[in-house]
């Protein structure tokens, strides 16, 4: 029974937390991933994230190619629902996740001295993510494994694929769906700093990745081609108590050139900084709140600009945890 109680406490600390943006950031603000997303938990765990995001700036928060108009003033309210399944791949920890964005986006554009307005609402492009650990601890397969878990230094392989199924209007440039296949390959790294004490857990997390894009053959009647976008995300996370933690977040993104109807425009760089706060409500329910903003938000600037606020709630469950809870409660 002592093992069951210890595992219950450990489960509260290590419950799987999703917040998106990931994706997003291209699912939640240009697909940037929330801190602690790639912490490992018991294989076989199921998780359902629900994410709400509000973003503003001059770039579509659902387009990681950063195809933007400096004169634009955009606002987006996005909700994201998903499902994730932790599963071993051979002797390695793995995960398969699906995320579906929905909501509305609108914006004003200055063209020829006059102001025009565009808007889009409905579903965005769904994303599928595959994750496999390359370096790090063995998969957490049972209760004793969970008690012994420490991330140490771990590195994963992540492959994302976004399907062109979202709302798209070929008469305008602003859409929830992007009308093309695109995806990401990356290697997220989690580095444990110091001892793994529940109320003082500290990690440095780094995620280099590259986005690859297919062609959009009907971008306002023309063909849009985008070179790869390179991203580097970093998070320094720290527990303040056993249930409450925070993170300092930074993202650097360098988009490739875009070619529309044979005319090429140069890519742009963007640096965002912000914070995330997380709270483990109970062993199966987690809450995160985060904010990020580009460093240069001067009015009239030709730089990429974005402000993003996100809140997420994630629930998770596993048959072993549920069984342990029933035994510990005498049910």
Annotate each language-model stretch with its function.
Residues 36-44, 87-95, 136-154, 194-202, ...:
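Short loop/turn motifs that connect adjacent beta-strands in outer-membrane beta-barrel proteins
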Residues 104-226:
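Outer-membrane pore/translocation modules
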Residues 44, 73-81, 121-128, 153, ...:
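Residues that define the transmembrane beta-barrel architecture of outer-membrane proteins
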Residues 26-28:
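N-terminal signal peptide c-region/cleavage motif recognized by signal peptidases
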Residues 50, 80-85, 128-134, 159, ...:
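Residues on the lipid-exposed face of transmembrane beta-strands in outer-membrane beta-barrel proteins
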Residues 48-54, 96-104, 155-163, 202-212, ...:
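Transmembrane beta-barrel strands of outer-membrane/channel proteins
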Residues 61, 216-331:
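Outer membrane beta-barrel transmembrane domains
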Residues 55-78, 113-116, 170-175:
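Surface-exposed strand-loop-strand hairpins of Gram-negative outer-membrane beta-barrel proteins
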């Amino acid at each position: 029974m002592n093992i069951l109680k210890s595992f219950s406490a450990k489960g509260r600390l290590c419950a799987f937390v999703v917040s998106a943006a990931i994706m997003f950031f291209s699912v939640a603000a240009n697909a940037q991933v929330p801190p602690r997303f790639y912490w490992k938990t018991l294989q076989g765990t199921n998780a359902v994230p629900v994410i709400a995001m509000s973003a503003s700036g001059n770039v579509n928060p659902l387009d990681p190619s950063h195809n933007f108009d400096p004169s634009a003033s955009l606002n987006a309210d996005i909700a994201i629902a998903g499902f994730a399944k932790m599963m071993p791949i051979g002797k390695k920890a793995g995960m398969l996740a699906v995320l579906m964005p929905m909501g509305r986006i609108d914006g004003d554009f200055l063209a020829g001295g006059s102001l025009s307005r565009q808007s889009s609402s409905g579903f965005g492009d769904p994303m599928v993510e595959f994750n496999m650990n390359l370096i790090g601890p063995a998969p957490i397969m049972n209760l004793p494994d969970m008690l012994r878990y420490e991330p140490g230094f771990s590195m994963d392989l992540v492959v994302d694929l976004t399907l062109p199924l979202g709302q798209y209007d070929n008469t305008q440039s602003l859409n929830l769906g992007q009308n093309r296949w695109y995806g990401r390959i990356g290697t997220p790294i989690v580095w444990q700093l110091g001892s793994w004490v529940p109320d003082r857990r500290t990690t440095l997390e780094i995620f280099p990745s590259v986005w690859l894009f297919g062609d959009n053959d009907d971008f306002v009647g023309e063909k849009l081609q985008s070179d790869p976008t390179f991203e580097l995300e970093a998070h320094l996370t720290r527990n303040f108590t056993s249930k409450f933690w925070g993170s300092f977040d930074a993202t650097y993104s360098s988009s490739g050139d875009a070619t529309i109807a044979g005319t090429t425009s140069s890519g742009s760089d963007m640096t965002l900084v912000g914070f995330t706060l997380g709270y483990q409500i109970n062993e199966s329910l987690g809450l995160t709140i985060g904010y990020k903003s580009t460093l240069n938000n001067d009015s009239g600037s030709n730089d990429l600009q974005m402000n993003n606020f996100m809140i997420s709630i994630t629930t998770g469950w596993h048959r072993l945890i549920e069984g342990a809870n029933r035994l510990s409660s005498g049910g």
